[in-house]
């Protein structure tokens, strides 16, 4: 009836068979097309770059992003699961440069822009097969046959439409600003790109002496960038601070009073004055490499000057700092720039011409020392930005750049951020919220090649025009090709006729930030507004997005920024932020450290379900995950192995009895354990729904895992004998029907989490019996919660019962007494449970008698004392009195409250002190002859004295266990009858004779033979040797 379970087949091979089944039956496509009339649930897949290989972090994002859409499809929603590829930008260009053996813009120009663009286009799908293989293998269901691709003309056209909207709102402008600039890539970067490349670096900062004109005095200034000193044009102070003139080592120096500790050696303050008195003081320039016109080299005010570091006087080079530039513009101080766009000193800087500026730092410091204008140099650790793609030190550099005026949208961005649900919630006001609060204008343009061209044309008369569609380009362009490709260099050949002077207009040379591409995917993937307007409107905003935490400064931000400008709202309602995947020791994975785990290897060795389940349960998704194969193996054993064993148990016995649950579809069991597990199942349905609806993935997985543990180690364990009965009586039918229905619905609940194993079980358990059901579990509906089947009192009592049993097992382990050894009595601190539960406790723990509501203090030694490192810090002198107060309290009651995470208040000398689990240390152990275990307010005590009668019963249970193990090891079928042989221990033979009827029943022994001459297995029965043999009867 059922397919026989092959226990030799690995889970990995089973998953590969399921992949083939899905492929053969086109299950994935059918899932995509399901619920056509259902309400939309929208999930956006953040586009990865396919010219890089997937890593284990991508597995985490994919298993999280797969779970919620699977669940929503089962709930009846229409879910678009469109894959996407991020294909533009520096990541692609750098890989192509590397493959061609060239580096930098001059070599690209020499190679040829058109050929370079073709290479970029050809390269973007280099690793797409690996991405697809990994996604399929992990069970990540998105439509990769019809993905959105950011280099596609339709996609770019939608971006042009967006840029035209931004232009029309007067939010897109060109400015000459000091911007973060990569000298290797030759382009400015945006603030969100810069934020991803910061590193803590140790560099040399210098304190330098600027001589005041016509006086033998020096202004002491500090800088962390000595290379900018040849471009110094001013010194900036804060006019509200107090400054002093000191004599230090024979020199007159001026600095902020609050930073006098920066001086070396002894000093004498000769004058104190407000910073305002320094304004306008002129000083001698340190270098004269670059000529300029206008007034410079005098002291000015800047609010940004602080007393945190340095001297309270800042060297100011307007070419290389935004604050410096603003300050100098305000005072009409000219800007000089002696650095090339490659980050090297120009020829005019004769001592260091051609040197990369950072490499020139040591030489400049040596020069300062030689000229006696270096006061001191010291190492300084600070956070500095590097290019997020090529890792080159960024410079702050003056460039003509196109900006989106995001500063004007700050209030709306904050509003939309607050209106979005963030998981965890602290992202709202923390990492993302703070970034939005400090938002600056988006440096949009890139002086590169492979990207969405900025659709702005300029005329020499100064007129500019932004184009918002291909249609508009054809209407206004001159000789636009029918098959125009919207990339450089082709689009650069398109000219427009100027409306003002009627001359030809040329497109500006820049492309745009590739993060604008990915942030435009909500509408650009549908070619909105040119097509699919209704489809877009039904799927905007998204109900769910999820990516790694670094996307708070990347994709999450650009999604929010663009949708706020265009649609005045966030493009997503719920954002689940994921932590990074670390190695076994909590270290970041890197090739350099040799601790990188390949997704392909992990999936081949451990399987997709085990990997998925580990990521769902290891920690909250937003926390870092320590990922290593042993942990995944443990995950497989604990959950998947347990679920599989329950399924195997059912199939084994149902097949023996030829039990068909469809013949008993209306059967209702009155068995208490059956009612309990059905009640727990329905509670689980409701709990899991609530968790998944609120994106509490870890809690949802944990509740399923706990249920599987209870199903195996409680329900099946308690009910095994019902399945062993030979007759298919009503009680046995109830057990079969219950376990079948539980497994069926449990697999539906677990299907979004572990899609492979649940499919395997469904195929054999459900589809093999009923061809009228869906052909895959992933085409089924989510099970309905039935309140009428929930008995909360039953669940509560059973939970307490199970807890007591686990405590009893713990106490036995502590006393080193096997569960097969009967004990006389157990005392339990909690109130009396109904008699049924008492019978369960006695049976499970092999106890003759139990007593509820017992006072355990007579059997337990309590040791409760203050945790001195905690309490001592706060109440040091009171500790003796605190100890006295603790010892005067009911120790059992106090321990129960503290273990239950309650707070107990005491008063010492009018001071109220709160005692809790953090500031108290509690140890409890049973007195001689007793074993104790406790959890929260529940405690138990076992009487551990073993009488001769109890010992005899213990021997019987050991003998039964050995016989059952021998049956299993001999490969006997469950229903095989046997002959039992025992020998060579009179005492144990008497036990067998006394309980022969019971032994025969439980082991299916037809006959027992004593002391026959044959081969035996020597067994250890509680320290005594006993020979046992079994033989199958044909």
From Swiss-Prot:
Signal peptide: none annotated. GO terms for cellular component: cytoplasm. It comes from the Bacteria. It is found in: Cytoplasm. A motif ('KMSKS' region) lies at residues 588-592. Pfam families: Anticodon_1 (PF08264), DUF5915 (PF19302), tRNA-synt_1 (PF00133). GO terms for biological process: isoleucyl-tRNA aminoacylation. Its main location: cytoplasm. Its cofactor is Zn(2+). GO terms for molecular function: aminoacyl-tRNA deacylase activity; ATP binding; isoleucine-tRNA ligase activity; tRNA binding; zinc ion binding. It catalyses: tRNA(Ile) + L-isoleucine + ATP = L-isoleucyl-tRNA(Ile) + AMP + diphosphate. Keywords: Aminoacyl-tRNA synthetase, ATP-binding, Cytoplasm, Ligase, Metal-binding, Nucleotide-binding, Protein biosynthesis, Zinc. ATP binds at residue 591. InterPro entries: aa-tRNA-synth_I_CS, aa-tRNA-synth_Ia, Anticodon_Ile_ABEc, Ile-tRNA-ligase, Ile-tRNA-ligase_type2, M/V/L/I-tRNA-synth_anticd-bd, Rossmann-like_a/b/a_fold, tRNAsynth_Ia_anticodon-bd. Its EC number is 6.1.1.5. SUPFAM superfamilies: Anticodon-binding domain of a subclass of class I aminoacyl-tRNA synthetases, Nucleotidylyl transferase, ValRS/IleRS/LeuRS editing domain. Disulfide bonds: none annotated. A motif ('HIGH' region) lies at residues 48-58. Catalyzes the attachment of isoleucine to tRNA(Ile). As IleRS can inadvertently accommodate and process structurally similar amino acids such as valine, to avoid such errors it has two additional distinct tRNA(Ile)-dependent editing activities. One activity is designated as 'pretransfer' editing and involves the hydrolysis of activated Val-AMP. The other activity is designated 'posttransfer' editing and involves deacylation of mischarged Val-tRNA(Ile). Monomer. IleRS has two distinct active sites: one for aminoacylation and one for editing. The misactivated valine is translocated from the active site to the editing site, which sterically excludes the correctly activated isoleucine. The single editing site contains two valyl binding pockets, one specific for each substrate (Val-AMP or Val-tRNA(Ile)). Belongs to the class-I aminoacyl-tRNA synthetase family. IleS type 2 subfamily. HAMAP family: Ile_tRNA_synth_type2 (MF_02003). This is Isoleucine--tRNA ligase. It comes from Clostridium kluyveri (strain ATCC 8527 / DSM 555 / NBRC 12016 / NCIMB 10680 / K1).
């Amino acid at each position: 009836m059922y397919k026989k379970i092959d226990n030799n087949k690995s889970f990995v091979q089973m998953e590969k068979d399921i992949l083939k089944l899905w492929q053969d039956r086109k299950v994935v496509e059918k899932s995509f097309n399901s619920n056509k009339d259902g309400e939309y649930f929208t999930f956006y897949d953040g586009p990865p770059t396919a010219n890089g290989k997937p890593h284990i972090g991508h597995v985490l994002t994919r298993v999280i992003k797969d779970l919620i859409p699977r669940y929503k499809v089962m709930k009846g929603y229409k879910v678009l699961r469109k894959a996407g590829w991020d294909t533009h930008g520096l990541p692609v260009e750098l890989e192509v440069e590397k493959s061609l053996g060239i580096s930098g813009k001059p070599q690209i120009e020499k190679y040829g822009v058109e050929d370079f663009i073709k290479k970029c286009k050809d390269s973007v799908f280099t690793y797409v097969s690996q991405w697809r293989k990994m996604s399929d293998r992990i069970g990540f269901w998105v439509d990769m046959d019809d993905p959105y691709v950011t280099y596609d003309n339709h996609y770019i056209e939608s971006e042009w439409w967006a840029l035209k909207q931004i232009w029309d709102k007067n939010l897109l402008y060109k400015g000459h600003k000091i911007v973060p600039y990569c000298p290797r890539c030759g382009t400015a970067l945006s603030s969100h790109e810069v934020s991803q490349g910061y590193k803590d670096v140790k560099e040399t900062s210098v304190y330098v002496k600027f001589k005041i004109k016509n006086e033998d005095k020096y202004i002491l200034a500090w800088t962390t960038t000595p290379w900018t000193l040849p471009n110094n044009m001013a010194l900036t102070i804060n006019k509200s601070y107090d400054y002093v003139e000191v004599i230090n080592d024979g020199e007159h120096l001026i600095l902020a009073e609050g930073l006098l500790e920066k001086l070396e050696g002894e000093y004498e303050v000769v004058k104190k004055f407000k910073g305002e008195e320094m304004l306008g003081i002129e000083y001698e320039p340190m270098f004269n490499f670059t000529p300029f016109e206008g007034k410079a080299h005098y002291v000015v005010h800047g609010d940004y000057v602080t007393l945190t570091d340095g001297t309270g006087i800042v060297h100011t080079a307007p070419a290389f700092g935004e604050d410096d530039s603003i300050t100098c513009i305000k005072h009409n101080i000219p800007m000089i720039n002696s650095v090339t766009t490659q980050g090297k000193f120009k020829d005019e800087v004769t001592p260091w011409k051609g040197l990369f500026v950072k490499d020139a730092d040591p030489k400049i410091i040596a020069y300062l020392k030689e000229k006696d204008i270096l006061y001191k140099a010291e190492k300084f650790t600070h956070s500095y930005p590097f290019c997020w793609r090529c890792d080159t030190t960024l410079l702050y550099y003056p460039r003509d750049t196109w900006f989106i005026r995001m500063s004007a949208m700050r209030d709306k961005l904050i509003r939309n951020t607050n209106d979005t649900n963030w998981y965890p919630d602290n992202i709202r006001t923390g990492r993302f919220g703070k970034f939005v609060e400090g938002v600056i204008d988006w440096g949009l343009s890139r002086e590169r090649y492979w990207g969405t061209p900025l659709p702005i044309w300029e005329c020499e008369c100064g007129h500019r025009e932004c184009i918002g569609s291909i249609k508009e380009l054809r209407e206004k362009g001159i000789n636009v090709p029918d098959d125009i490709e919207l990339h450089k260099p082709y689009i650069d050949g398109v000219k427009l006729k100027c409306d003002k002077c009627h001359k030809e207009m040329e497109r500006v040379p820049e492309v745009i930030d590739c993060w604008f591409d990915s942030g435009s995917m909500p509408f650009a993937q549908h070619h909105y507004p040119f097509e699919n307007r209704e489809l877009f409107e039904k799927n905007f905003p998204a109900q769910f997005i999820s990516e790694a935490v670094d996307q708070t400064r990347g994709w999450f931000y650009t999604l929010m920024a663009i949708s706020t400008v265009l649609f005045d709202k966030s493009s997503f309602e719920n954002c689940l932020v994921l932590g990074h995947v670390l190695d076994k020791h909590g270290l970041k994975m890197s090739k350099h450290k040799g601790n990188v785990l390949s997704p392909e290897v992990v999936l081949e060795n451990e399987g997709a379900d085990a990997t998925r389940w580990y990521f769902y349960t290891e920690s909250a998704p937003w926390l870092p995950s320590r990922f290593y194969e042993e942990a995944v193996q443990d995950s497989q054993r604990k959950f998947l192995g347990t679920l599989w064993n329950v399924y195997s148990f059912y199939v084994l016995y149902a097949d023996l009895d030829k039990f068909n649950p469809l013949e008993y579809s209306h059967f209702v069991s009155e068995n208490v354990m059956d009612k309990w597990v059905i009640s727990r199942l329905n509670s689980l349905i409701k709990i899991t729904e609530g968790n998944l609806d609120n994106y509490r993935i870890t809690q949802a997985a944990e509740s399923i895992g706990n249920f599987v543990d209870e199903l195996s180690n409680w329900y099946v364990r308690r009910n095994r004998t019902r399945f062993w009965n030979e007759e298919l009586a009503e009680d046995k039918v109830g057990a079969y029907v219950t376990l079948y229905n539980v497994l069926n619905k449990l697999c539906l609940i677990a299907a979004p989490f572990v899609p492979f194993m649940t499919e395997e079980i469904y195929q054999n358990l459900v589809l093999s019996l009923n061809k009228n059901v869906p052909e895959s579990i992933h085409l089924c509906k989510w099970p309905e919660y039935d309140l009428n089947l929930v008995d909360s009192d039953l669940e509560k009592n059973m939970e307490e019962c199970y807890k007591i049993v686990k405590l009893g097992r713990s106490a036995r382990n502590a006393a080193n007494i096997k569960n097969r050894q009967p004990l006389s009595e157990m005392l339990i601190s909690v109130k009396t449970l109904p008699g049924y539960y008492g019978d369960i406790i006695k049976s499970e723990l092999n106890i003759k008698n139990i007593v509820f509501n017992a006072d355990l203090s007579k059997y337990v030694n309590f040791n409760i004392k203050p945790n001195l490192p905690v309490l001592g810090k706060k109440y040091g002198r009171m500790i003796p009195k605190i100890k006295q107060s603790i010892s005067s309290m009911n120790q059992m009651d106090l321990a129960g409250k503290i273990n239950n995470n309650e707070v107990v208040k005491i008063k010492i000398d009018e001071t109220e002190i709160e005692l809790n689990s953090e500031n108290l240390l509690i140890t409890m152990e049973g007195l001689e002859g007793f074993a104790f275990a406790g959890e929260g307010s529940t405690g138990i005590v076992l009487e551990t004295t073993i009488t001769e009668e109890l010992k005899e019963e213990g021997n019987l249970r050991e003998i039964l266990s050995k016989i059952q193990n021998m049956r299993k090891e001999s490969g006997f079928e469950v229903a095989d009858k046997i002959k039992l042989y025992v020998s060579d221990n009179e005492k144990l033979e008497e036990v067998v004779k006394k309980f022969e009827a019971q032994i025969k029943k439980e082991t299916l022994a037809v006959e027992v033979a004593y002391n026959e001459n044959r081969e035996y297995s020597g067994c250890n029965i509680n320290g005594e040797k006993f020979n046992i043999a079994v033989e199958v009867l044909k």
